[in-house]
Amino acid sequence: MEAEVINQLNNTLNDLEKRSEDIRVYMDYQGKKDRLEEVIGLSEDPELWNDPKRAQEIGKERKILEGIVLTLDNIATGIEDNRMLIEMTVEENDEEGFAAVQEDVAGLEKQMADLEFKRMFNQPADPNNCFIDITAGAGGTEAEDWAGMLFRMYSRYAERKGFKIEILEEDDGEIAGINRATIRVEGEYAYGLLRTETGVHRLVRYSPFDSNNKRHTSFASVFVYPEIDDSIEIEINPADLRIDTYRASGAGGQHINKTDSAVRITHEPTGIVVQCQNDRSQHANKAAAMEMLKSKLYELEMRKRNEEKQALEEGKSDVGWGSQIRSYVLDSSRIKDLRTGYEVGNTKAVLDGDLDGFIEASLKQGV
């Protein structure tokens, strides 16, 4: 074993120790550890399960806290253990054992990188589930097909992350794709990961719907907003709501059109409209639509609060509904984020849900 390799491994452990100390301060390790002990106590109380919703919230909080506290504990233990193992394997000239130490240290680096990535989740709702609204722009079939491609892209991304998805509303295009859709994404940090996808997505390709095989440009809008729980109070005056029922359209089985089970709620002071047609029950669809409305009102309030701050940040683009954020040029095999400059050539992989590079770049640059 070369001295340079041994020194490099020891330096890696020293670097990990310093990064671990920094992130313990930044993430308030002791505060989270104390809270984890409280949450474990709450979760072991048999009476908690009399309130399933509260039990679910406690379970979610416990998982998030354990992901930070136990990972930092594991890294600290791993650093000390591997320092001793380096000494032992060097003394015994145990190359196989030394290789195992190198592999274990690489695993610790991966855990640290994952924690450092979570530092970028700095909004209160980042750990929450989220909703994604996808709407085709002008252009008929071309735009509707593009909206359908985005629908699939985000569905595949969610599957890759092990998230659950639920289609709450889907309006099929006349020939292909969708006119609009809303999906719910359930998973740890779903909103934090996906929130920077809000904006207008532009597609340039040779159209499969054009017999002359001309190049077409299509647009679709994406809006991501967090699912909020009872810890965030959103007051809604029933007098501000207009509630309409209608027969659902789109995918969902033959039963979906037999009754007026779909629900549309309009919040008249803001003009926000939410729709749900996922369930046979009008009552269930109304409840789901109300949750979507609460989430949209929360997102609207958060955007208002951040408006002044964003205006002062030089070079920071407006990520509102009307802003173009990403260009997908398929015939040139190029997808580029217009805010961060991040670009890839494997268009097929991106449209199949490989969005990690784009999301990491946008979070690091704070778009």
UniProtKB/Swiss-Prot annotation:
Q: List the subcellular locations.
A: Cytoplasm
Q: According to the UniProt entry, which residues carry N5-methylglutamine?
A: Q254
**Which SUPFAM superfamilies does the entry link to?**
Release factor
Q: Does the keyword Endoplasmic reticulum apply?
A: no
What do the Gene Ontology cellular component annotations say? cytoplasm
Q: Which family does it belong to?
A: Belongs to the prokaryotic/mitochondrial release factor family.
Output the HAMAP family linked to this UniProt entry: Rel_fac_2
Name of protein: Peptide chain release factor 2
